[in-house]
Amino acid sequence: MVLLIAGASHTGKTLLAQRLLERYRCPYLSIDHLKMGLIRSGRTALTAELWPILREMVKTAVENGQNLMVEGCYIPFDWKSSFEAQYLAHIRYVCLIMTERYIESHFGEIKTHADDVEHRLDDSGCTKEGLIADNTANLAQCRAHGCDYILIDGDYAVDITL
């Protein structure tokens, strides 16, 4: 089984994947690690090509009967169109989405928890307005494409059973 965990920046994708790794011993790939590897190796033009590479990695995991989680911001909302039925039967997708109300009332906590798993070098670009815009857009895209999502509106209690 492959689990795709999507969502805007700061929604807790990596933290969720880390918790699921610890609970189920299922490995995960952070798309940010792949992206940073490309950037640091001077291959910045390749960052736009992440989804085709990830898609083929997912197919390989399914073909080999391996469990894998892939988390990050670069999973397209029309991801299903990249796979035939025999693959889709083994892939789950969830997008983490924070409501405007949650962001408004918990922005300080969101910023505080930004480094729970990964150490961000510069988080100054994270603004309340940006988070609201990104999460609102993601919710609209999830609804338009019929994607499963977890709406974070009250207490932050994101969990998935594999």
Regions inferred by a protein language model and the residue ranges of each:
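Hydrophobic anchor at the beta1->P-loop junction of P-loop NTPases
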Residues: 5
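Glycine-rich phosphate-binding loop used to anchor ATP phosphates in small-molecule kinases
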Residues: 48-98
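A glycine- and Lys/Arg-enriched "phosphate-lid" helix/loop adjacent to the NTP-binding pocket
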Residues: 91-137, 141
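Conserved glycine(s) of the Walker
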Residues: 12
